[in-house]
C-alpha cells in the first residue's frame, strides 16, 4: 500500500515539494494539501510559476480538490492543525511547510491529528532529529524520531561540502556567507519588519541579514560545533544562491586537491547531492538543478598555492534543490515506516 502524505502550507516550498515528489517519488501518494488560499488559486499557482514556468502536466480543479495529472488532491483550509483530518485520510507523513509550526510542540499537533511522522521543511526547535541527506541520515531511527527537520536550503548546501572538507583536511574554523535570492519573508517595497534591514525593498537592495545555517551545521556534523559562523546577503534575484566559505584547515593542501576531494565525493557517496562545475557559469545556469550543492571549481582558492587557508564557493537552487531534498527525505522516511 502506498505511503500517504499531506502537505501543510502550499506556498513556494509546499508547491515545489509536491512537484518534486511527483517527479522523484511517484510511488508516494499525496492525498491532501492544507492552505488558507482557495482551491482555484492553489491550482493556478501550481500550474503556472513565474520562476520555473508552467507545470509539465495537467492541472484542473473541482470545488474541493486540485486535480494533477488526473489525480485528485484534496484542498483543506483549516488553520488549527489539531483539527486536520489526517486520521480520516490515512495520512502517514505530513510535510510541514507553513513556516508557522517549526517548534516541535506545535508540529506535534499533526501527530495528534493522526499522522505518524512530521517532516518540517525548515530549521526547527525541539525536533527529534535534523537530517541533511548525504551527511547524517544514517542516524535516523524510525522508532525514536517522529518530528524531523530537513534543515534549511543553505545548510543543505553547506553541510555536504563541509563534510568533505572536514573528512579530508580537517576544519579548524570557518566563516560562511550565503549570497541568497530574496524570499517571501522580504518586502517588495519598504514596510515595517522585525528585521530593519529586511524591511527594505527586496528588489532594489543587497540586504545583509542573519542565517542559522552555520550554527545548524553542528546539528548534522557535531564536531564542527562552535567552529563555523556566518551571515546572509540577500540579493534581488528570484532563485539560486551561492555559499562563500572561507576556512582554516588542519592540513596543508591545494585548490586542486580540494576539488579532487569534491569530485570523488560527487561521484561516490554524495552522488546526486554534491556536484562540481568546471564551467564559468552564473546563477541562472543552476535554476532547476536538483542537487543540494554545486562547487564552482574555478573559484576554489588556497592562499599561496599550498596552505591551510582556503575559500570554496558552491551554488544551490534554494527552492528546487531544497524541495528535491524534501521529496527525497519523505521517501527515505516512508521506506522506514
Segments the model singles out, each with a brief description of its role:
Residues 194-196, 233-238, 299-303:
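Short, flexible, solvent-exposed loop/turn segments with mixed acidic/basic and small polar residues
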Residues 18, 108, 159-166, 177, ...:
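Predominant activation on well-ordered alpha-helical scaffold segments within soluble catalytic domains
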Residues 144-145, 201-203, 240-244, 309-311:
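Short, solvent-exposed beta-strand edge segments and adjacent coil->beta transition regions
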Residues 1-199, 304-305, 328, 336-337:
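N-terminal Rossmann-like NAD(P) cofactor-binding subdomain of oxidoreductases
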Residues 230, 242-337:
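C-terminal active-site/capping subdomain that shapes the small-molecule cofactor and substrate pocket
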Amino acid at each position: 500500500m502506498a505511503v500517504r502524505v499531506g502537505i501543510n502550507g502550499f506556498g513556494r516550498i509546499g508547491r515545489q515539494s509536491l512537484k518534486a515528489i511527483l517527479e522523484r517519488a511517484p510511488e508516494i501518494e499525496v492525498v491532501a494539501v492544507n492552505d488558507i488560499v482557495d482551491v482555484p488559486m492553489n491550482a493556478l499557482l501550481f500550474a503556472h510559476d513565474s520562476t520555473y514556468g508552467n507545470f509539465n502536466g495537467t492541472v484542473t480543479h473541482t470545488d474541493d480538490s486540485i486535480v494533477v495529472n488526473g489525480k485528485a488532491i484534496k484542498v483543506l483550509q483549516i488553520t488549527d492543525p489539531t483539527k486536520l483530518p489526517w486520521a480520516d485520510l490515512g495520512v502517514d507523513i505530513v510535510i510541514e511547510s507553513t513556516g508557522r509550526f517549526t517548534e516541535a510542540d506545535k508540529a506535534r499537533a499533526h501527530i495528534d491529528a493522526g499522522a505518524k511522522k512530521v517532516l518540517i521543511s525548515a530549521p526547527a526547535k525541539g525536533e527529534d532529529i535534523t537530517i541533511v541527506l548525504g551527511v547524517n541520515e544514517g542516524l535516523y531511527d524510525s522508532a525514536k524520531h517522529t518530528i524531523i527537520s530537513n534543515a534549511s536550503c543553505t545548510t543543505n548546501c553547506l553541510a555536504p561540502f563541509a563534510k568533505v572538507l572536514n573528512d579530508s583536511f580537517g576544519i579548524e574554523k570557518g566563516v560562511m556567507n550565503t549570497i541568497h535570492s530574496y524570499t517571501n519573508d522580504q518586502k517588495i517595497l519598504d514596510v515595517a519588519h522585525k528585521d530593519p534591514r529586511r524591511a527594505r525593498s527586496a528588489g532594489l537592495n543587497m540586504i545583509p541579514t542573519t542565517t542559522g545555517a552555520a550554527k545548524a551545521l553542528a546539528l548534522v556534523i557535531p564536531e564542527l560545533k562552535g567552529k563555523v559562523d556566518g551571515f546572509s546577503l540577500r540579493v534581488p534575484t528570484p532563485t539560486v544562491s551561492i555559499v562563500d566559505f572561507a576556512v582554516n584547515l588542519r592540513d596543508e593542501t591545494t585548490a586542486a586537491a580540494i576539488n579532487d576531494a569534491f569530485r570523488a565525493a560527487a561521484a561516490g557517496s554524495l552522488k546526486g547531492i554534491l556536484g562540481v562545475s568546471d564551467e564559468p557559469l552564473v546563477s541562472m545556469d543552476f535554476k532547476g538543478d536538483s542537487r543540494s550543492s554545486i562547487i564552482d571549481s574555478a573559484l576554489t582558492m588556497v592562499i599561496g598555492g599550498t596552505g591551510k587557508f582556503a575559500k570554496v564557493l558552491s551554488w544551490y537552487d534554494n527552492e528546487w534543490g531544497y524541495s528535491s531534498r524534501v521529496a527525497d527525505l519523505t521517501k527515505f522516511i516512508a521506506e522506514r515506516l
